[in-house]
Amino acid sequence: MMKKYEIGLYEKAMRNTLSWSEKLGCAKECGYDYMEMCIDVTDEKINRIFMNTAEKKEIMEAVFQAGLPIGSMSVSALTKYALGDPDEEIRKKAMQIAEKSIELAVDLGVRTVMIPGYDIYFGESTIETKKYFLENVKKIAEIAEREGILVGFETMENNFMNTTGKAVQYVNMVDSAYLKIYPDAGNITNAAVENQHDVCEDLSLGKGKLIALHLKETKPGIFREVPFLTGHVQFEKIINTAWSLGVRRYVTELWDVGKENWKEDICFANQSMRTLLDREA
């Protein structure tokens, strides 16, 4: 029977000490269809973009052995190295990370790359930072067009791009078939509560531009490490809207915070979200 949707697991939900084989095996065991790999701000993860052929081969062998693909990639390193940073050296590093991440995605069979919607993370957003951000995002779209990889803006925590509507503006300015939006259910919920607008109306502004959805729990003003179904995200309502807008790829975003039963949390995230997704399917 044809699957109606796919659900992926955020890599950082698992213990960092696990091998690729163990991570992929864990995701499969907990009921996922794919894994989302992370290129985060740590040197260890950023260095993945310089992987040699043998290392890539090892990952691909793990993928085939587990029977579970790496379906997407989150490039959160672009917080520390922001695309709109006033420092030219930081912007160059950001562009290197972006380009090499997209090239790595090609080599690993990853088709969707998520970039954070920040012009600058550490520092003040200005006309200048917004200008640099747009310039570099246009370059990223050209790289994505060349490599055939879909890139999506993640809606983030701060005012610059914390709603789908704001992401749409940049997608329209760049106007590329390969640059779309990868919203975060938790972040757009927090923005909706703070700014008193309807989260599903905001999500609907992205119609035709949504490539996947991060399913993440939040509380007002708290954006990370909130256990599933203990916060204020209306998953049923958001999934229902996302489904009606054609979203068929979902990733549960949660973190290993050192708990002994971290694996149970992953299985719970899968089961609770699949229950809602299966109602749509």
Feature locations, PLM:
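N-terminal pre-domain/capping segments
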Residues: 1-106, 176, 180, 197, ...
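Hydrophobic faces of well-ordered beta-strands that scaffold small-molecule active sites
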Residues: 5-11, 35-37, 70-75, 113-115, ...
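Acidic/histidine-rich catalytic cores of soluble enzymes
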Residues: 6, 128, 135-232
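Active-site beta-loop-alpha junctions enriched in small/polar residues
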Residues: 10-14, 38-42, 75-78, 118-120, ...
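Aromatic/hydrophobic pocket-lining residues that form the small-molecule binding cavity
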Residues: 20, 56, 94, 98, ...
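An active-site-proximal structural segment forming one wall of the substrate-binding cleft
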Residues: 87-108, 112, 133-147
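Active-site groove signature of glycoside hydrolases
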Residues: 108-124
